[in-house]
């Protein structure tokens, strides 16, 4: 009984550590597609972006009910956005901005004029993202997750 309780507490601590560290890693990896975030992003901007990624991770956790699933979703979103942004920066030297959503048809029509071959840097960062997604397999599932309507009320 006591050993079971200790294992449960250990799993909760590991999940909490993952909920704190993985979103920060996702931010830095996403930024690594286009530049070195530690030297080119101001400290306060790094802090607020990491807080934003933490907030997204916790929201996903409350919606999904599983740490592993929430963090995997966040890693996939960060990877896709980072790759998309890297190609946009490569082609027009400006990052993705919200109003780019309105010009997606134009982007699709001229996409055949560009070379989408990834460079070594993109491949390495993508492999690191995929390794992070795979390593989350070792985070134990929660026993007895709360249904979504109960999570939203709490």
Label every model-predicted segment:
Residues 2-154:
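Transmembrane and membrane-interface helices of multi-pass
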């Amino acid at each position: 009984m006591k050993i079971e309780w200790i294992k449960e507490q250990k799993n909760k601590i590991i999940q909490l550590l993952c909920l704190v560290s993985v979103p920060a890693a996702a931010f830095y990896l996403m930024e690594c597609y286009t530049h070195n975030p530690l030297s080119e992003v101001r400290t306060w901007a790094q802090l607020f972006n990491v807080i934003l990624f933490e907030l997204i991770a916790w929201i996903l956790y409350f919606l999904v009910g599983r740490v592993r699933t929430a963090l995997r979703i966040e890693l996939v979103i960060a990877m896709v956005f980072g790759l998309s942004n890297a190609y946009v920066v490569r082609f027009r030297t400006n990052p993705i901005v919200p109003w780019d959503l309105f010009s997606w048809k134009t982007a699709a029509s001229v996409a055949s004029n560009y070379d989408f071959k990834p460079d070594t840097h993109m491949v390495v960062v993508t492999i690191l993202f995929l390794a992070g997604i795979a390593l989350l397999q070792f985070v134990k599932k929660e026993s007895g997750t709360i249904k979504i309507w109960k999570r939203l009320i709490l």
